[in-house]
Amino acid sequence: MEGVTGVTWTDDVVPGTEQWQRFRRLFTGEVNACVEGLFTAGATGVLVNEAHSSQRNLLLEDLDERAVLLTGRHKPLSMMQGIESDVDGVVFLGYHARAGEEGVLSHTYLENSITGVWLDGRPAGEGGLNAALADEHGVPVLLVTGDDRACAEAADYAPSAHTVVVKECVSRYAAICRPPARTAADIRSAAAESLRLAGRTAGDVRPHRIEVEFDAAHLAAAAAVIPTVEQVDVRRVGFDAPDMTEAMKAFKIVTTIAARAVQGIYG
């Protein structure tokens, strides 16, 4: 949701605020533009997996009736739930840049506590992690939308994917935003064009290592209590997994434990 046009501030994406109510509509509008483009190009079905915060932000009553919505929390594969089913491509809509980089509301999973994530030694954000999981299932990333920094980041993990820049980052809390009518038109067009990339292939199943760096030492210590997770530095933990699916399950546990260990204003 942080990568939707107009979104620049915490209240824009925090459930329950007045601004969040406004941006739920804009978020749903961008999703509908994508859905329309995919069906126009010949898609036979679209599953929308809602994955921001409570994962209950999109307005089902306003969703394109040809799509179906996966909403709610505690999904085994989180943002990528559904990848294990018969899908031929994925779209990352409303994405943001990774933690530690410039970008509107940039972060990786936790808003502030994580300062960096590395997948097999390379920096990775939510897009990079999710793309690796898609690759394990042989599913290509068709389209990425968000600010200019998120789209530039996509070139590293999904070089063949189409991108739509809906706003240009000025700072973590400011952006030059394009009106929804214009971004919707571009998303619709790019989604239609991107469908030519669709097609499931043999998956790349192999072991992976993830390392996570936090902004405070006690968060790393808390995460290191998890079996198989080791504390490799004062603020960093790492773990190995036999495949990306298991790696993401372990990553989810690490972030959950770390989030619980955050203590008030001191973090």
PLM ranges: what are they?
Residues D11-C34:
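Short catalytic helix/loop segments, enriched in acidic residues and glycine
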Residues E65-M80, G116, A161-E168, R172:
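Acidic, His- and aromatic-enriched active-site or binding-groove loops in soluble protein domains
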Residues M1-E2, A51-H52, L93-A99, D148-A150:
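Short glycine-enriched loops at secondary-structure junctions
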Residues V46, T183, R188-G267:
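C-terminal accessory domains and tails appended to enzymatic cores
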Residues W9, G29-S85:
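Glycine-rich nucleotide/cofactor/substrate-binding loop typically near the N-terminus or early
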Residues N49-E50, V90-G94, V144-T145, E213:
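Short beta-strand segments
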Residues E136-V141, T145-E193:
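Active-site rim beta-loop-alpha module in soluble metabolic enzymes
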Residues K75, E111-H137, L143-R149:
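Active-site glycine-rich loop that binds ribose-phosphate moieties when present
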